Amino acid sequence: MPIKKLISKIVKKKDSDTEKNNYINLSALTEAEREIITNTIELKSKSVREIMVPRVDVVMIPMESSYDKVIKAFNRDRNSRIPVYKDGIDDIVGVLYVKDLIDAEEKNFSLKKILHKPLFVPISISLMELLKNFREKQIHIAMVVDEYGGFSGIVSMEDVLEQIIGDIRDEYDEEDEEIKSNDDGTYLVDARTRIDDFNKYEILPPIPDDEADTVGGFLFSYLGRLPKRNEDIEYNGYSFTVVGKSGNIVTKIRIEKLKKDNTAKNKD
C-alpha cells in the first residue's frame, strides 16, 4: 500500500492498538516509512498548543490597513498568510493571502473584499483532528482560541506536517541555530525556541512554561509588557537582552550569566 494512502487511512479512521502495530510492522515499509506512520499515529495524542505560533509572535494587521502597510507586513513577516483583526487582536475577522494582492489595485484597495474566512480551533484540539479539519475544509491555516474565545496563536498545515516528516524549510527560512554559544560566554537564542527545548540546555537557567510556550513569550509574560530592543532583563542570575526585533515581535535574545557582584548589588 502506498505510504500516502496509508497515512490517509490512519487519519480517517479509529484503529485498535493491534491495527496500529500492523501498520508499523508491515514488512514492505522502509524504516523511514515506519517512522512516518508512527509520527502520524502520535498526532492523536498531541494538542495544537504544543506546536502553534503563540500570539506574541504572530504578525497581524488591522482591517483599516492601507495597501502600503499590508505590503510592508508581508515583506517583514515572509509568510504567505496574515491574520486580520477589527476591534482588537482577539477579534480576528479574516486571513489575507499574499497571492490575493497580485490583482489588487493600490488606488481602490479594500482589505475587506479580499479576506478569507478564518478557521477557528480550540487550543485543546488534537493534531489529528486539526489535520482532518484542514483536509475537509481545504484550508492551510487556523486561528487558535482559548476556552474564553481569546486569540492564542496560529497553526498551519506545514506545522502539522513537520510533526510527521520533520522540518520543512523554504527559501525564506534561515538556518540559524535556536541556541548558539558565543566565544565570549554568551548565548544567542531564537525567541521562538520552545521553553521545553530551551530547558534541555542545563548550562542555561531553566524558565517556567506555565504562562508561555517560547522564550520570547516568557519575557513578555515576565515583564507584563512587550520588551524593548536592547533592554536588559535580569532573571535568576542571568541577563536576557533583546538584540533583535521585527516590529513588536522579539526575534533574538542574548543571554549571559551575571557576575556575582552585579547580582549582589541588585539584591541590595
Curated annotation (Swiss-Prot):
The keyword Repeat applies. CDD domains: CBS_pair_CorC_HlyC_assoc. GO terms for cellular component: plasma membrane. GO terms for biological process: killing of cells of another organism. GO terms for molecular function: flavin adenine dinucleotide binding; toxin activity. It comes from the Bacteria. The keyword Repeat applies. Keywords: CBS domain, Cytolysis, Hemolysis, Repeat, Toxin, Virulence. Residues 52-111, 114-171 form the CBS domain. Disulfide bonds: none annotated. Bacterial hemolysins are exotoxins that attack blood cell membranes and cause cell rupture by mechanisms not clearly defined. Belongs to the UPF0053 family. PANTHER family: HEMOLYSIN-RELATED, UPF0053 PROTEIN SLL0260. This is Hemolysin C. The lineage of its organism: Bacteria, Pseudomonadati, Spirochaetota, Spirochaetia, Brachyspirales.
